[in-house]
Amino acid sequence: MADKMWGSEPFWGLGYEWDPDWFYTERQKELRALLIELCEKELRANAKRSDDELLYPRRNLEVLGEHGFLALTVPEEYGGLGENHVAYAMTCETVARYGCASTAMCYVMHMGAVNAIMLRPTPELIDRYIRPLGSGKIGTLSYSDPETGSHFWYPISSGAERMNGGFKVRKKASWTTSAGFADFYVVQTTSPDFSGYDDLSVFVIDGEHVEAQPALWDALGLRGNQSGPLEVPDIEISGDQIVGPVGDGAASNDESVDPWFLIGSSSVWNGIAMGAIDIGKRHTTRKRHVDVGLRVADYPTIQDYVGEAVIDTNASRVFVHSVADAMDRATENNTKQLAPGEFARADFLHWAWQIKFAAAKNVARVVDKMLHACGGSGYKRDMELERYLRDAKAGWVMGPTNEVLRQFVGKAVLLGFEVLDYWNQTFNRRAVENEVKKLDPAAKRELAEQLMTQADEDEAKKAQPAKA
């Protein structure tokens, strides 16, 4: 096995023997070596500037674009590298580990937008948004909503209507990575002629039609993300800018947006964890206590910290790569074109929830333990560990939050997938009946009258003719 290099010197962290290389093709190993080289030459140095100055990492993204990574999973016939889910996981992890976590997260959102378009490609979308990726065009996803928080799949503050052969789109988002900096935005809104529940649609909005406030972003970590509020203020777009048919949004979530985002973001958290371990190894093997003649790495407690961190992080890495590999198998190595109504990645969505939970939980613990291992030196900014620590804390709270995910999994295991009421449409009959039992007869009659009035109003609304 070749030595892992950092410039002209052997890498000072963990070697390739601690990486899950059995998942990778020879080409993917070459891509990883190229990424490490790019991180050493430029990306890692730029990470400090992004963190210090709240600077959007455009230059780092341009570097990735110069080597084809902005079109990593795009078929070669459209100018991409034609790679798969495993290569994507490797890329996100590698950039976060050796380079810049903010760049890695912006990259995740960029690839989320790219793959949402590639789920339902049209010649117009390909020519307008996919082929230009080679010239450094950057996309992002805008799916959050100020009214629903981390329940990003429920866009209340949005809408679209048909107009002049195209659409008028309005969108408000509380969090959008690359807001104000991306060249195009893949957004989700309620559909034209919204029929309720999961009737959602996906559109691509050009950057000049988006209003953003990047100056408001000043966070604990991932300080280059510029993940600020965004608005699309009733913009008219052409009919070519819808992604998939009207009403395809929920299917797009399950088949593209969620799987790609969860694989990518989980890989970022794993990369941050490995990067912190790399720094911990470098410090503890070099720092000596002259009075006892030992390096910090010679103490059993430090060995325990590092050993457990490596074991837990590699368990998470293999978990992520396994789910990515399963999606590769289901999609014929990311080459299968699915028609609306067909699913492949969505069959593994409940596994994708688990990898995000595991990776985010693990990285928060690992960075703390590496700080303990490095002691006061790790608390200082010049070691970089404190930046990794701050970046890591985004994992747990980034939507879907770990609280949401573990409830999804617990509910699905105990009660079945059908109880996962994403759009708040199914009532809990047991809870309702239990609450009604507490009412006296007068209160029950009052509630019944109120419900009958609401039922009459709902029936009247349904009877109204639809707008042309």
Where are these regions (language model features)?
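Glycine-rich phosphate/pyrophosphate-binding beta-alpha loops
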Residues: S174-G180, W260-S265, G395-M398
